[in-house]
Amino acid sequence: MNLKIEPYIQFLHDVPVMADSSYSVLNRSDFYVEDALVNKGRGRNIGIDITLERFLEKGLYYMISGSLFDSRYRGGDGVWYNTKFNRNYVINGLIGKEWMLGRNRQNILSINLKLTLQGGDRYSPIDREATMNHPDKEVQYDETKAFSKQYSPMLIGNYTVSYRINKKKVSHEFAVKGLNFTGAKEHYGHEYNVKTGKIDVSDNSTILTNVSYKLEF
């Protein structure tokens, strides 16, 4: 069994920001912008990573890891905010078991499970008045309180069940993999609902099951 603890602190300087605004490229997943930027922003990440791991022994292994962190930035207005990605915590649990089967115990039945619990994404409060006044009802946000709101935590679950048949010159592996069997939802922002006159959360849950066969020789 192995325990590892890693604290860290990171400072970012000369980050491109928009003058007199909460905008910073630290919150962007793409870097296409139309407005002029200045290198006067800053960023700060503080956290600790903890990992407890048992290596494979007697067909069993597991790992539990957790990250507690605080991620903030200073915009072009000189104010410190949460970054978009400041979930505050991520906890992972991974466990697997193998059984040796067959006449000569040469085949392997394997079951693996991974669960991830993490804080929700950050978003800015909705400016309802500005949204209603927008000609296309495009949702507007109060950027003076950038990323002060947070979606609900997410629980993501994945599993794999496989059976490997080992022969002298060839091996066969049958596997079933399930991704996000817990139905966790990804959030993509908000949109105005013309029918109800309300502003709804835009989200989606993708659950995948993959059946595979692999031949090795």
Please describe what each predicted stretch is:
Residues 29-37, 74-78, 139-147, 193-197:
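Extracytoplasmic loops and strand-loop junctions of Gram-negative outer membrane beta-barrel proteins
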Residues 115-138, 152-156, 163-217:
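C-terminal beta-signal and adjacent terminal beta-strands/loops
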Residues 16-23, 29, 69, 73-80, ...:
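Outer-membrane beta-barrel translocator domains and adjoining extracellular loop/strand segments
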Residues 8-11, 32-120:
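Gram-negative outer-membrane beta-barrel transporters
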Residues 40-44, 83-89, 147-156, 203-207:
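Short sequence motifs at beta-strands and strand-loop junctions characteristic
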Residues 1, 58-60, 89, 105-111, ...:
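Outer-envelope beta-barrel architecture signal
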Residues 3, 46-50, 89-95, 155-161, ...:
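Hydrophobic, lipid-facing positions within transmembrane beta-strands of outer-membrane proteins
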Residues 1-33:
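Membrane-embedded beta-barrel scaffold of Gram-negative outer-membrane proteins
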